Structure formats: C-alpha cells, structure tokens
Design a protein with these regions (language model features):
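Bacterial Sec-exported substrate-binding components of ABC uptake systems
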Residues: 2-77, 190-228, 280, 288, ...
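A short, structured surface patch at a secondary-structure boundary
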Residues: 66-130, 134, 139-143
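Short helices/loops that flank or line small-molecule/ion binding pockets
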Residues: 123-134, 149, 270-280
Length: 345
C-alpha cells in the first residue's frame, strides 16, 4: 500500500486535535473514514491470497519495484497493461522480445539507481530505500532473507505489498502452464484496476492459440529440443535444456513434444554431450537470454549434431520472452507451429 493515507483519514485525524470526543472515537472515526475513502475508488479494495500471504490493496500501486529473477514476465505484464509509469525500479531485461518495441520499452524504464547484489538483484537496504508500495518477484527467492533480500514481512512494515508470480511459491516452476501467464495478467489487472484490459489480452491469446492448435490437430508431433543459448546452469556440457514447465505446454499447443521431457524431474536437465547426441531431435528451439544472436547458437548446434533430423532439415527457431511466463505465449505457439508444420500455414 502507498504510504500516503487517504485524504478522508488525514482529515479525521486533524479534527481529533480540536474535539474532545476523539479519545474514545478515533478508532471508529478513522475506520469509517477509511471505508468511505475506499468506497470512493471503484474497484477497491482488492484482496489477493499469494503464497499464503494476504495482500489487500485500497488503491493502485504507484511505486512498483520489479525484481530480476532471470525473468521478464512481470515487467512485460505491466507494460502490456499500460502500467510502465507505475514502475520506479525494474531489474528485468532479456534484451530482446518477439513483441515489437517491448525490449526498448523495458530498457527505458528506471532501474532505481541501486547497486545490485551477487544475485544481480536488489538487496534489502536498497529495496527499503526505494520506498516501494509493491514489489514483484517471479519466485519466493526474491524475498528470502538468507539471500540478502528484504522479506515480505519487512516490506509490509514499510508499507509495501509483495507478490510472487504463479507457481513461484516453492521456487519450482516445473508445473507451470500457459494458464499461469493468464493468472499473472488477471492478478495485475485486479491490483491496478485494469481487469478489462487483462481479459481482452487473455481472450486474444486464447483465440490465437486455439486457432493454431486446430490447424495442427492430427499432425505428427515432432520431438523438439528447447534450451537457452550460451547459458550454463550445471556441470555438464548441456545444462540449460528444458525438461518441464510452461515450455512443454507451448510445445503441445504448437503440435510438438519435448524430446527431453523425461530427462529431469525439475524444469531443466543437465546432460552430457553423449546423452544429447543419442537423442533424436526433430526440431530445435533456442531461447535467447541477453544473447544478441541466439540463431547463430542454434546453427552451431545443428552443425555439432549432424545426425539429428533437425540438422538434416535445418529446422530451428530462435525465441525469447514469448517462451516464458508472460503475456505473449501465443506468439511462441504460432512461431513453433509454423516451424514444425509449415505445410499447414
């Protein structure tokens, strides 16, 4: 919540200084005044249950801090809802996007001028100094004190609401689906009184995805390798291969399957070159994360594994934010379907 109190509440407090009845009636009067002020704002109050924490909003936040979390879901959702002016500090950026102008819009947002910690995110003291009224984190990691971050309770004490994105409560995003992108849009739509806009975005995405899925229905489902370009997450040669999560839902809607879905119980697989070479890969999806040329990385992989059907047919696509939690999953579904089933488009 904003640290600014409603005008009606402030006025009630001022009146208490000059009346003799305030000693007994301050609580009642203040509550009534706050209820009156809240009633004057259509769409509020809004209450969200988020990872076991109840968050109540009596007005739209105006000092939002978006934590990094190796995500662009939260900042992209805010921009899709036309809320860029509410952001006082954003740490998210992929440096590219399937949505024209989005990468530039993200770059233009303020970063708060803070010095980031070793996790490339906003440390506790700097966060408090930003005076946020809402802090967004893609997982609960961003509110873990042992990681050097301000906790949700500490932020509540300084008047800030907090929000962990869908499936991020336990830091396990392996069950994430496209529906979670819609949940994020809906939640932010409610918080900022932009529900109508959120529902329009969701309806358009659902329509696009349904149209693509209808076209590829009944087609053979190629086996697809999805991985991040030039990124190391483990000790093996290929540690950023996608195994589970929203990526698989996108592949399914596009008429494909994940070639490495069984390689790990978590979101990512950490595999040797030999294991990768022994797997049939019909198509390749490379996700660019601050990589200026993920397509070059894709071509390099195809040369490295010429036995793949993907290499023989030069079947690949380079994507970025549309493959992750966020408002643009329909773009990834479309582009992957066009790659996998060119004869149907």
């Amino acid at each position: 919540m904003s640290k600014k109190r409603p005008v009606a509440v402030a006025l009630a407090g001022a009146l208490c200084l000059v009346t003799t009845a305030c000693a007994d009636a301050t609580g009642t009067t203040g509550a009534a005044a706050e209820a009156s002020a809240t009633a004057a704002r259509p769409g509020y109050p809004v209450t969200l249950e988020n990872c076991g924490v109840t968050q109540k909003f009596t007005e739209a936040p105006s000092r939002v801090v978006v934590m990094n979390g190796a995500s662009v879901a939260e900042v992209s959702t805010l921009l899709a809802l036309g809320l860029g002016d509410s952001v006082v500090a954003n740490q998210q950026s992929y440096g590219m996007s399937e949505v024209e102008g989005r990468a530039e819009a993200i770059k233009a947002l303020p970063d708060g001028g803070v010095e980031l910690n070793e996790a490339y995110d906003v440390p506790r003291e700097a966060m408090i100094g930003l005076r946020p009224d809402l802090v967004l984190s893609t997982t609960s990691y961003g509110f873990d004190e042992k990681n050097g971050f301000a906790t949700r309770e500490q932020l509540k004490d300084v008047g800030a609401r907090t929000y962990v994105s869908p499936q991020g409560c336990d830091q396990d995003t392996s069950k994430m689906t496209i529906a979670d992108s819609y949940a994020l849009l809906r939640d932010m739509g409610r918080v900022f009184d932009r529900s109508d806009r959120a529902e329009r975005l969701i309806a358009a995405s659902e329509k696009n995805i349904a149209g693509v899925s209808a076209k590829v229905k009944g087609e053979k489902r190629p086996k697809v390798m999805v991985l991040f370009s030039n990124m190391a997450m483990g000790g093996n040669d290929f540690s950023s291969i996608v195994a589970k999560g929203i990526y698989n839902d996108i592949l399914a809607e596009a008429g494909g399957t994940n070639a490495f879905a069984s390689a790990s119980k978590t979101s990512f697989a950490d595999l040797s070159k030999e294991k990768v070479a022994a797997t049939d890969v019909d198509a390749l999806v490379v996700i660019g994360y601050n990589d200026p040329n993920p397509a070059a990385y894709a071509r390099k992989l195809l040369k490295e594994f010429p036995q793949w059907p993907a290499a023989k047919n030069n079947t690949y696509v380079a994507l970025s934010d549309s493959m992750y939690l966020g408002p643009s999953n329909d773009l990834a579904v479309t582009k992957i379907a066009e790659m996998l089933h060119p004869d149907t488009f």
